[in-house]
Amino acid sequence: EVWSSSATTLPKEDDKSEFDKNSVLERFNYQLKTSGLKTVNTLRPNFSWASSDIDEIKRKYDLKKYILLFPFCSPHLSIKKWPYYNDLIKLIIDKFGEEFKVITAPSSKEINDAKKFNAVCILDNEKALDISQLTKLIQDSSFIVANDTGPAHIAAQVGVRGLTLSG
């Protein structure tokens, strides 16, 4: 049994440092193909199937145009936490006024932390959104700003414009 990686699948004559300059998706596609798998959608991933209807939540919070912030991170990765979200929120409100609502959608463990930010905390019946609700909230946002965390990766997969920040 051989572990499949770029190190094990790349021909000896190819330079790994050059290969590593390719995008993650291109490298992943190469690895899958050389392992004998068909790769129809690897270079064009589509995560939109993972979203659910959140119209009721959007009505409750009057969400039309909104900027979604994810100022959270895993407790053991606090180095990734950017400390200036409230400053950013003030800049957004000063520039756009009520044109965009500034919101956040914490996980169940982040609900108390969300109170530290001057953003509307989006919950479903006082509970954190599930992954499909979160995906739809991200998908419908005007822009996203996040620490290097799961929602930032979801935003990339559903094609939402945004910015990922680190400490």
Over which residues does each language-model region extend?
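Catalytic machinery of carbohydrate-active enzymes
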Residues: E1-G167
